[in-house]
């Protein structure tokens, strides 16, 4: 029995034997001897009545439709301590580092902003802070900063938040720090008609123009706000530079160029370019009607960082379309999802799309699609939709003008909420990883998807060399990978739930074992959610200890619709990590559980208890008549070590 899932092989016997011109129609392959078939070409064309799993022609359709040829797909998962499973957004500071700092937000009222540090090389997650900032629906780190981020909530407020400095030294005597709100941006007060505000409106998107931390864009209630952060620092109540009312606005993405005025926007009207110098924007009714009829409305769009003229947009019909602003038309359709697309990410020319169906699709766009003047339809490499079988020619055929460039990664059993892509410090395309959060409050790190059919994983290495031993010793002594260390800096390091999808073909079983990562031990392969180590719970404090670190500069009218609880600014020292939390009535209310810093060792063992003479008689255990209490006591001391280490029966031990 294999140690991984292998689907049942269901097939139908050939109703008619494949036609071979050199044989009679009623001839049977089994009756033909090798002396009759002297031509090697005739032997190769001869086909058996029975299904032959070793024949590539018989298994070609099965392998592609069931994805049996795929391997080398690896995902690591961590559980985010959000009991309500209400995650909303994820943001990362730097995509070109091996230890990125990222944040995960929730729409809960307390303990809903988590700050983590990810070790891409060692596959470890370190929790630094848990902050209470109610109802976060969108956020963005300031460019080139790991201390400040902007968050948006459901009340129409955006906050510039100062995050405590990450303590990597493990010094417990460091100065106490806490998160604080540096500035508030009130969107709701700048809308003329309060009756037009939808009660479900949230600040769904925040971003900066061209990595410039002085220009902030945000979406609230079908309005695009443009803020100047430099003027906001000097103003008591920040005022936006412009407010553009755009009906059906869903998302935007600034151009990755030095042009600080053009922004790509999308919504019910489709996709469009927007000039910030002309804040008035109207959509013709005919365009809205046509987009609604053809389901061309879009909810996501991302510019290609390698080509300023190309962007990808996710439309309501579940198709990702590639657009070229020079042609004012789309030149490719990427079809691979069965539900609404929730996230798009570019990574070195390739595109990743996440959907509510729980799948992440990697679109291999390495070839220059723009050089091809013909319209291109792109589909999946595997699955039932990727198979086009010609029964007359008995072979697979590609659809006309279709390129199979999508590979599916089943990343979640619920839905994908947000994604980020990282490449590491060496910017290697082979080390490309995708980060995701889903509706089950899981954070996942997915390795790049390879087409492993043509990859040879065989190795003639049968023993460790001296260089291998030295390399393993260095990795064991590293503070970044040593899980069992008692240092305070490693107390919050969490190992992932590692899931490796192996090939289900027997020919690739050995290759899949060789592709398993060597830096994850059996102790890190956790079997359930309860075994995962989560972030430490916030400390319960009294009302007398509350202390606001910085007073918010604003008038009383800003607090009519939104009230902050003072505990959001409480400096709490928890070991070497500063956290902020509300006062809790009990541990169950916190929604965060804490476990030991290192994985539990699950070693099989048996427990035995030494029995005296009376216990033998009461329990009716067999023994010799000459066996007395004194002999038993002497024998007990002699056999004590073996009883504790060897799982044998009492009769074998005491009658020996």
From Swiss-Prot:
GO biological process: cell division; cell wall organization
Record carries keyword Cell cycle: yes
UniProt KW keywords: Cell cycle, Cell division, Cell wall biogenesis/degradation, Repeat, WD repeat
Keyword Repeat attributed: yes
UniProt-listed SUPFAM superfamilies: WD40 repeat-like
WD repeat residue intervals: 131-171, 198-237, 291-333, 336-373
Top-level taxon of origin: Eukaryota
Role, per record: Involved in cell wall metabolism and required for the separation of the mother and daughter cells.
Family: Belongs to the WD repeat DSE1 family.
Protein name: Protein DSE1
Lineage: Eukaryota, Fungi, Dikarya, Ascomycota, Saccharomycotina
Chain's gene name: DSE1
């Amino acid at each position: 029995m294999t140690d991984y899932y292998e689907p049942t092989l269901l097939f139908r016997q050939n109703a008619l034997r494949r036609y071979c011109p050199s044989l009679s129609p009623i001839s049977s392959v089994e009756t033909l001897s090798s002396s009759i078939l002297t031509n090697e070409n005739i032997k190769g064309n001869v086909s058996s009545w029975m299904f032959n799993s070793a024949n590539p022609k018989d298994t070609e359709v099965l392998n592609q439709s069931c994805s049996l040829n795929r391997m080398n797909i690896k995902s690591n998962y961590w559980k985010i301590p959000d009991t309500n499973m209400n995650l909303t957004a994820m943001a990362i500071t730097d995509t070109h580092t091996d230890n990125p700092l990222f944040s995960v937000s929730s729409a809960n009222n307390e303990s809903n902003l988590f700050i983590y540090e990810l070790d891409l090389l060692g596959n470890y997650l370190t929790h630094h802070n848990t902050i209470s900032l109610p109802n976060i629906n969108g956020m963005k780190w300031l460019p080139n900063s790991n201390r400040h981020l902007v968050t948006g909530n459901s009340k129409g407020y955006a906050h510039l938040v100062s995050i405590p400095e990450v303590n990597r030294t493990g010094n417990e005597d460091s100065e106490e720090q806490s998160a604080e709100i540096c500035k508030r941006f009130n969107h709701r007060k700048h809308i003329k008609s309060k009756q037009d505000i939808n009660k479900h409106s949230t600040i769904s998107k925040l971003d900066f123009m061209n990595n410039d931390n002085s220009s902030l864009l945000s979406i609230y209630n079908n309005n695009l706000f443009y803020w100047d952060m430099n003027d906001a620092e000097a103003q008591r109540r920040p005022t936006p530079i412009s407010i553009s009312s755009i009906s059906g606005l869903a998302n935007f993405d600034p151009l990755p160029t030095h042009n600080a005025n053009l922004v790509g926007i999308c919504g019910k009207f489709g996709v469009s370019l927007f000039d910030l110098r002309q804040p008035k924007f109207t959509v013709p009714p005919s365009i809205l009607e046509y987009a609604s009829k053809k389901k061309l409305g879009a909810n996501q769009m991302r510019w290609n960082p390698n080509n300023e003229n190309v962007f990808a947009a996710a439309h309501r019909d579940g198709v990702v379309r590639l657009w070229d602003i020079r042609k004012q038309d789309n030149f490719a359709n990427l079809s691979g999802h069965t539900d609404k697309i929730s996230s798009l990410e570019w990574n070195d020319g390739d595109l990743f799309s996440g959907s509510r169906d729980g799948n992440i699709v990697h679109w291999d766009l390495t070839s220059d699609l723009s050089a091809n003047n013909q319209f291109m339809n792109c589909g999946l490499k595997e699955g039932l939709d990727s198979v086009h079988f010609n029964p007359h020619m008995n072979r697979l055929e590609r659809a006309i003008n279709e390129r199979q460039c999508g590979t599916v990664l089943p990343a979640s059993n619920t839905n994908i909420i947000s994604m980020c892509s990282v490449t590491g410090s060496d910017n290697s395309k082979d080390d490309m990883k995708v980060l995701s959060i889903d509706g089950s409050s899981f954070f996942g790190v997915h390795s790049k998807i390879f087409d492993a059919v043509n990859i040879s994983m065989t190795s003639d290495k049968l023993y460790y060399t001296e260089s291998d031993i030295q390399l393993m010793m260095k990795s064991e002594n590293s503070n970044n990978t040593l899980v069992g260390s008692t240092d305070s800096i490693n107390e919050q390091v969490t190992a992932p739930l590692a899931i490796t999808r192996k090939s289900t073909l027997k020919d690739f079983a050995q290759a899949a074992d060789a592709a398993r990562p060597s830096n994850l031990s059996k102790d890190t392969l956790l079997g359930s959610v309860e075994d995962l180590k989560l972030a430490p719970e916030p400390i319960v404090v009294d009302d007398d200890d509350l202390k606001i670190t910085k007073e918010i500069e604003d008038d009383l009218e800003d607090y009519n619709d939104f009230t902050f609880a003072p505990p959001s600014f409480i400096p709490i020292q928890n070991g070497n990590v500063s956290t902020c939390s509300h006062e809790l009535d009990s541990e169950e209310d916190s929604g965060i559980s804490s476990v030991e810093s290192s994985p539990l060792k699950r070693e099989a063992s048996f427990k035995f208890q030494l029995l005296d003479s009376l216990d033998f008689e009461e329990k009716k255990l067999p023994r010799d008549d000459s066996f007395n209490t004194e002999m038993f006591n002497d024998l007990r001391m002699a056999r004590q070590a073996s009883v504790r280490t060897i799982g044998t029966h009492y009769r074998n031990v005491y009658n020996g």
